[in-house]
């Protein structure tokens, strides 16, 4: 009798994606983050669904509805903090996943990579509109500052901002539409994830050496299912530790104050996972220039495959490129730190230097060093 998983139309798709999928035999734990992102997405959709059952997207009741969830709903506090810290875990996994792609040259699968960049932008948009929903001080002022950046667009800027706001300031209409966006975007992310996987399974996975592994494949199940379960347990352990022991560690205390248009917080800053981009935005004294730099800091990922000058795909055997890669990571950590600091000396100059280094590393140094390494191959 033929196995049902190989004959049933639906089971066949799942089988080819998660069970009989031929996988390189040497992929490391850096390849775990894809499945962890899937797990994060499922957790966020489920916790978000339960939160939406009790939340009211109205300026007069939004803040108190979140307080009600935490105080009166059974395990409401737990669901709320799982959702908030789940977003942080989501971004940790995202950045690790992108870092893996950069290090091992996975960006050479261009369709998969471009869908991935689109996914990153969608997740960032979802996180931004979600942060506005509790209607605390940082929610309100974060929404005001970030949406206001669109006014830097010549001619249509102001009209565009007022169109997004649904009025002349961030108000009831803004909150309602942001809730609608926050509800729909995760399902768009789920659809994009399916396309991401579709393109990946057209080519098969990359591996740490960057060398084709067609002659050395093993089935995904049981080898990588068990490996992914171990990764998932680690993720859940960290998430639970964060949620139960330090739920507000990554949040902003200002968000426990209800939104007040008449009182600006001393330091307006986004959640930690946006700080690097925020630092790049602030490092340019011109509004339009800052907005362009902010956009480019993310969209630069699209150009990575075009900047590949090395004859080797992976950085595994390229020590000089490795050095630059880890310099880039250190630079991003510096930018993250700067983004959370006030705009004063010496943070301004450090942020500007770190921003210049970020673009210089990706656009100039890495391609140049790759060419030098090509020359060294002939020695």
Swiss-Prot record:
The chain crosses the membrane at residues 33-53, 77-98, 113-133, 178-198, 226-246, 288-308, 320-340, 347-367. It is found in: Mitochondrion inner membrane. The keyword Transmembrane helix applies. It comes from Cephalorhynchus hectori (Hector's dolphin). It is a multi-pass membrane protein. SUPFAM superfamilies: a domain/subunit of cytochrome bc1 complex (Ubiquinol-cytochrome c reductase) (SSF81648), Transmembrane di-heme cytochromes (SSF81342). Belongs to the cytochrome b family. This is Cytochrome b. GO terms for molecular function: metal ion binding; ubiquinol-cytochrome-c reductase activity. One of its GO terms (cellular component) is respiratory chain complex III. Its main location: mitochondrion. Binds 2 heme b groups non-covalently. Heme b b566 binds at residues 97, 196. Its cofactor is heme b. Pfam families: Cytochrom_B_C, Cytochrome_B.
